[in-house]
Amino acid sequence: MIALIQRVSEAAVRVDGEVVGEIEQGLLVLLGVEKGDDEAKAKRLMERVTTYRVFGDEDDKMNLNVKQVEGKVLVVSQFTLPADTKKGTRAGFSRGAHPEDAERLYNYFSDQCESVLPTERGRFAADMKVSLVNDGPVTFWLQV
């Protein structure tokens, strides 16, 4: 399971022109679910995402996590993250989880985030338009 996290000052996701999720300061989490992923991996990844120190302290060092700055999380499913891009000019998607499994684990991950801090989410498998202001920019790839 993969989370591409971005520290944002604002982010929103729209489906058919309607805002379905929106946050101010916090983390935009693009979540990719791979074959073999399960609830235990989703919970471990949620714990890493919500405790990963990406926000500046009083000395402007990245020592604070999203909970410590009272930020929010916006979780967006991203089936392209597990893609195989090592060869050729077209990605291979065989490493991604089956859509039903991916949706279940996406919802589980989002619910776990929601249990510890304010969480918004995109709409699984929808054609989404994601807008964000990346603060820094600060972007990390987390994988379990």
UniProtKB/Swiss-Prot annotation:
Its EC number is 3.1.1.96. GO terms for cellular component: cytoplasm. Keywords: Cytoplasm, Hydrolase, RNA-binding, tRNA-binding. GO terms for molecular function: D-tyrosyl-tRNA(Tyr) deacylase activity; Gly-tRNA(Ala) deacylase activity; Ser(Gly)-tRNA(Ala) hydrolase activity; tRNA binding. It catalyses: glycyl-tRNA(Ala) + H2O = tRNA(Ala) + glycine + H(+); a D-aminoacyl-tRNA + H2O = a tRNA + a D-alpha-amino acid + H(+). Its main location: cytoplasm. It comes from the Bacteria. SUPFAM superfamilies: DTD-like. The keyword Flavoprotein does not apply. It is found in: Cytoplasm. A motif (Gly-cisPro motif, important for rejection of L-amino acids) lies at residues 136-137. InterPro entries: Daa-tRNA_deacyls_DTD, DTD-like_sf. Disulfide bonds: none annotated. GO terms for biological process: D-amino acid catabolic process. A Gly-cisPro motif from one monomer fits into the active site of the other monomer to allow specific chiral rejection of L-amino acids. Homodimer. Belongs to the DTD family. PANTHER family: D-AMINOACYL-TRNA DEACYLASE 1 (PTHR10472:SF5), D-TYROSYL-TRNA TYR DEACYLASE (PTHR10472). An aminoacyl-tRNA editing enzyme that deacylates mischarged D-aminoacyl-tRNAs. Also deacylates mischarged glycyl-tRNA(Ala), protecting cells against glycine mischarging by AlaRS. Acts via tRNA-based rather than protein-based catalysis; rejects L-amino acids rather than detecting D-amino acids in the active site. By recycling D-aminoacyl-tRNA to D-amino acids and free tRNA molecules, this enzyme counteracts the toxicity associated with the formation of D-aminoacyl-tRNA entities in vivo and helps enforce protein L-homochirality. This is D-aminoacyl-tRNA deacylase. It comes from Vibrio atlanticus (strain LGP32). The lineage of its organism: Bacteria, Pseudomonadati, Pseudomonadota, Gammaproteobacteria, Vibrionales.
